[in-house]
Design a protein with these regions (language model features):
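Jelly-roll (double-stranded beta-helix
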Residues: 1-316
Length: 316
C-alpha cells in the first residue's frame, strides 16, 4: 500500500512500550488510496506509532464487486522497511522492479524487503473471485539491515498450531516454538487466529514483547469486552498469554515484537533516520533514478511523490 496524503508530515517514531499488560484502543482512520479504494489505517496514528518493529497497518475490505479492479495501487517506492501482504478473502497481484509478478491468495504471504530501494504495484488480477479483504503491514528494518539489497519472497504455505478452539497461522516470526519460514530482521511475531467453533482460547505470548490485536471477522471478546471492528487494541508488555473468547468463524490478527530500540522517521512510503535521507529518496524517485528501478509489468503511470517540506519531524 501507499500513503497518498497530499502533503504528509514526517513522523518521528520511537519505542513507547507500556511496562506492563494494558489494553488501549486506537480507532483506525480512513485513507483513500485512489479510485475509491478506501482502507482503514490502524498504524501509525496519534498515540501509537509502533508495536515492536511494526510501523504501518492498513486493513481493507471486506468488499464485493462485479467488474473492474478495486485495488489498483500504481508503482511507488519504498526504503528501509519490509511489506507484509495478507489476505482474508480474494486475490491480489504484486509486481515489482526486480521483475517479480506474484499472485497471492488467502493463507499465503508476500514479503518484500525494500532495503535501500524498490518499487512495486498492487492490483486486483483480471481473473478474480469478486471479493477482497486483507491487510498490508510494514516492518521497520533495523539500522544494520535497512540499506541491504531489496528482495521479494512468496510463501505459499505457512505453519499452523492449535490452541483450544482456535487455529493460529504463524505468518511472521515465532509463536510457541512454531516459526514462520519468512526472514525478518527483528524479534517479532505476526499471527492470524481463526476460531473453528465457539469457545475460549489461551494463546501463549513472549512476555518481553509488546503486542496488539485487530479484529478481522466475527465476534471476539478480550477480558469480557467485545472487540470493535476497525480498532487496534494495544496490549502492552509482560503478558505471558492472551485469553480470548471467540465465536465460530471469528478471525483476528496478532502482531508484536521487542520494543524497537531505534528512532525512525516515516514520510510517504519511506522509513529513514534523517530528513536528508528522505529528501534524497524522494529526489531519486522523481528523477527516475536506477535506485528504485521500473515496474515494467504494470500498465499505467507510476505514483508521483508528494511535495516535501522539511519541517521539524512531528513527534509521536
Amino acid at each position: 500500500m501507499s500513503n497518498l496524503m497530499p502533503s504528509p508530515d514526517a513522523l518521528e517514531c520511537r519505542a513507547d512500550a507500556a511496562s506492563a499488560p494494558s489494553v488501549k484502543a486506537y480507532r483506525a482512520r480512513s485513507a483513500d488510496l485512489g479510485g475509491g479504494f478506501v482502507v482503514r489505517r490502524a498504524l501509525p496514528q496519534t498515540g501509537r506509532r509502533l508495536v515492536g518493529p511494526w510501523c504501518f497497518l492498513d486493513h481493507f475490505g471486506p468488499l464485493s464487486f462485479h467488474a473492474g479492479k478495486p485495488m489498483d495501487v500504481a508503482p511507488h517506492p519504498h526504503i528501509g522497511l519490509q511489506t507484509v501482504t495478507w489476505l482474508v478473502e480474494g486475490e491480489a497481484l504484486h509486481k515489482d522492479s526486480l521483475g517479480h509478478e506474484q499472485l497471492i491468495r488467502p493463507g499465503q504471504l508476500n514479503l518484500m524487503t525494500a532495503g535501500r530501494g524498490i518499487a512495486h504495484s498492487e492490483e486486483t488480477p483480471p481473473r478474480n473471485s469478486r471479493t477482497l479483504h486483507g491487510l498490508q503491514l510494514w516492518l521497520a528494518l533495523p539500522d544494520a539491515h535497512r540499506c541491504a539489497a531489496p528482495s521479494f519472497h512468496h510463501h505459499g504455505s505457512l505453519p499452523m498450531v492449535t490452541f483450544g478452539t482456535c487455529r493460529a497461522m504463524v505468518v511472521i516470526g515465532e509463536l510457541d516454538g512454531v516459526r514462520s519460514p519468512a526472514q525478518t530482521y527483528s524479534s517479532t511475531v505476526g499471527v492470524e487466529l481463526a476460531a473453528d467453533r465457539d469457545g475460549h482460547t489461551a494463546v501463549p505470548l513472549a512476555a518481553s514483547f509488546e503486542h496488539a490485536i485487530l479484529l478481522l471477522v466475527g465476534h471476539v471478546e478480550l477480558d469480557d469486552r467485545a472487540l470493535a471492528p476497525g480498532t487496534l487494541y494495544y496490549l502492552g508488555t509482560g503478558r505471558e498469554q492472551l485469553s480470548l473468547r471467540l465465536r465460530a468463524g471469528a478471525r483476528l490478527m496478532l502482531i508484536g515484537g521487542e520494543p524497537f530500540g531505534e528512532r525512525i522517521l516515516m514520510w510517504w512510503n519511506f522509513v529513514a533516520r534523517t530528513p536528508e535521507e528522505i529528501a534524497e529518496a524522494r529526489s531519486d524517485w522523481e528523477q527516475d533514478h536506477r535506485r528504485f528501478g521500473d515496474v515494467r509489468a504494470y500498465v499505467g503511470r507510476r505514483l508521483p511523490a508528494p511535495p516535501l517540506t522539511l519541517r521539524p519531524p512531528r513527534p509521536r
